[in-house]
């Protein structure tokens, strides 16, 4: 009788129930097979650096990797091009990871890492087939409202996922106690996007005006939905948005600076204490009106400003090419300068003649309104969703 197939994550991948139960790891390592070649979808990997996969992972893993076929892979080089990370996971690194965090490897094959604490690889638990395991210190942190023992970061992330504004947080844990909080850690295991971030994606891929406007309208709508739930991301930037496919949608990641509408938060380790939650996550994205004292969060007008910067990153690759220190480099001639940079960098697909150029000019004008120095002059989030949708 054929094995029963069940979806492992929201219907993207279907695996036999036996595979979900048994997992990917071997009960005991085996000797490496000299003829083994790691195959992931259409790509047979030439490097031998990942031969350890055969030693530690069973046929459930290698068969699933071989059969992967997400729609965003158009050619074999996409398999590893889309996978983030700066260094390959070798066997020694894998064994260290397995010793400390082996439960996360049940259905996860880590192949790359960054700084030895962020691991990227493949998992059927992710809708994209790619997943990320992140390990970080957690000696500070805030608590979710009315949810003792749950970090605000997790609460915001799970709420955003419910609103389709964030990738799935598959598993998480906080280790440590109040007494040893300086050595406490948070571990998150979640879905991973293409190239790791929107910044990485649009550094390599060219967008059409349609894709750009659609992504920005969708992102703005998701931020508005989160605010209506009383959640502010706190570190809005291109690096904290991932692309789940070639045309979007964009989804928010890294909620460690998330906060509520007020200026005070409850301490995670000392729930009876509150403190002022002041920081802007990334100074380069701070709006010009941000004060230096308490209440430094961006607020809604500040979020509109940050959306404008994200839009510039899509349009010209790096916002600093046209906009620095809250000011257009070319002053009132910014429209022509932005278009010149777009043409020079090839970051937007300008095919379509005069109609496309008119739409680009309309997009530049809307972004300029987001970047007004006076917060009162910026459009509301509701208006922004509507106007991005009309471009």
From Swiss-Prot:
- Give the species this sequence originates from: Ictalurid herpesvirus 1 (strain Auburn)
- List the InterPro entries: Kinase-like_dom_sf, Prot_kinase_dom, Ser/Thr_kinase_AS
Q: Which domain of life is it from?
A: Viruses
- The UniProt record gives the binding positions of ATP as 134
Indicate what this protein is called per its UniProt record.
Answer: Protein kinase ORF14
As recorded in UniProt, its EC number(s) are: 2.7.11.1
Residues of the active site are 235 (proton acceptor)
> Is ATP-binding found in the keyword set?
yes
Q: Which reaction does it catalyse?
A: L-seryl-[protein] + ATP = O-phospho-L-seryl-[protein] + ADP + H(+); L-threonyl-[protein] + ATP = O-phospho-L-threonyl-[protein] + ADP + H(+)
Protein kinase domain residues are 109-391
List keywords of the entry alphabetically: ATP-binding, Kinase, Nucleotide-binding, Serine/threonine-protein kinase, Transferase
**What EC class does the entry list?**
transferase
Q: Which GO terms describe its molecular function?
A: ATP binding; protein serine kinase activity; protein serine/threonine kinase activity
Coiled-coil intervals in this record? Answer: none
* A Pfam family assignment: Pkinase
Give the record's family classification: Belongs to the protein kinase superfamily. Ser/Thr protein kinase family.
